[in-house]
A protein has these predicted regions:
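Non-transmembrane, aqueous-exposed alpha-helical and coiled segments at domain scale
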Residues: 1-349
Length: 349
């Protein structure tokens, strides 16, 4: 394997027992043998998401143990931003949205590894040759016709969720899927892997080596996704407490789009939270701090899914189907979908 990416590093999700496990591994002198990165934490790097002293201390223990193991503590769920995985290379990643992204859009090979297995694989330099590390295991098993048109970020997420709910498992082969930008590709990958066990889809004309996959496909199932299906997933929304972007982490283009839309309107009535990677945050420079004057809170290394900060809200509007799935389950907060343009409008309603 060339790289590893470790999930389950938020104190909210692994607690003291998880911290002790990482500290034990570090105490043995173990070190990762390949370039290894880490998922988001419960605490952001700039202190935007205020948390208790207990969470702060626990997250510090986890970060120190990871560093002792040689992990690059990137605290990002989008390692594909800075790891340019090549087709037909092997990786041990444990964040499902990232696995789906590199499998689908780069034909880099990773199975859905549990966080501890990815870490142990990083130390050993090897992982078990499970199905998605073989061409046989990557054979498409279902035909999916997408009759929706170019997919924006919300539509791409809904399509991913619908495929996941209808198929559940296997490898879908998509015809007619068109993603309008990078954010839509991210949201599709995140939703597909959130609403099913699938972490790989072959997109005709997009996935590297898609013709080879089509040649070996055994398409036992067949489904269609229409514009009416997508419309049926939407519902009327109320007034949110906050608007949230960045699940998965927003890239620099998305952050700049948000800031541009807000600057046109002036200070937002309701706060807009944007989670991104430390690398993108650094690129933004003074823009991140200046955004506070517009009621836009940009933070790095954490997200509203894995931070207890989220529990202070009652209603969140977002264009992320992954956030819609996880936040109610982890925090008991209502989350509803909106296209990103509509999400901006809701911040001024």
């Amino acid at each position: 394997m060339e790289t590893a990416h470790v999930s389950g590093v938020s104190y909210l999700t692994i607690g003291d027992y998880g911290a002790e496990f990482l500290e034990f591994l570090a105490s043995t002198g173990a070190k990762v043998s390949v370039f290894t990165t880490s998922n988001p934490a419960a605490v952001d790097l700039g202190g935007v998401l205020t948390v208790s002293d207990e969470v702060l201390r626990g997250q510090g223990r986890i970060a120190r143990a990871l560093r002792a193991l040689g992990v690059s503590v990137t605290f990002s769920c989008a390692p594909y931003d800075f790891i340019l995985t090549r087709p037909r290379t092997f990786h041990a990643w444990a964040e499902s949205n990232a696995i789906t992204y590199i499998n689908t859009f780069r034909d880099a090979w990773s199975d859905k590894n549990p966080g501890p297995l990815a870490l142990l694989g990083a130390i050993a330099g090897f992982v078990p040759r499970t199905s998605l590390y073989t061409l046989e295991g990557r054979r498409p098993t279902a035909s999916v016709k997408i009759d929706v048109g170019p997919l924006d970020s919300l539509e791409a997420g809904i399509v991913g969720a619908l495929i996941g709910e209808r198929l559940g498992s296997g490898v879908p082969y998509l015809r007619g899927a068109s993603f309008i930008d990078e954010e839509s590709r991210r949201e599709f990958a995140a939703a597909l892997s959130t609403y099913s066990s699938m972490v790989f889809a072959v997109v005709e004309g997009v996935t590297p080596n898609w013709r080879e996959y089509l040649a070996v496909a055994e398409l036992r199932d067949k489904i269609e996704i229409s514009r009416d299906d997508v419309a049926g997933y939407l519902k009327d929304v109320g007034e949110p407490d906050v608007v949230y972007f960045g699940c998965p982490f927003a890239d620099v283009d998305t952050v700049l789009w948000i800031l541009g839309e807000v600057k046109k309107r002036g200070r937002a009535k309701r706060p807009i939270y944007v989670s991104t990677s430390p690398g993108v945050y650094k690129q933004l420079g003074d823009l991140a701090k200046a955004a506070l004057d517009l009621n836009v809170h940009i933070f790095a290394g954490a997200c509203l899914v894995v931070s207890p900060f989220t529990r202070r809200f009652k209603h969140i509007a977002t264009n992320s189907l992954k956030a819609i799935f996880y936040i109610p389950r982890l925090h008991g907060v209502e989350v509803f979908p909106c296209r990103r343009e509509r999400c901006i409008e809701l911040a001024y309603a």
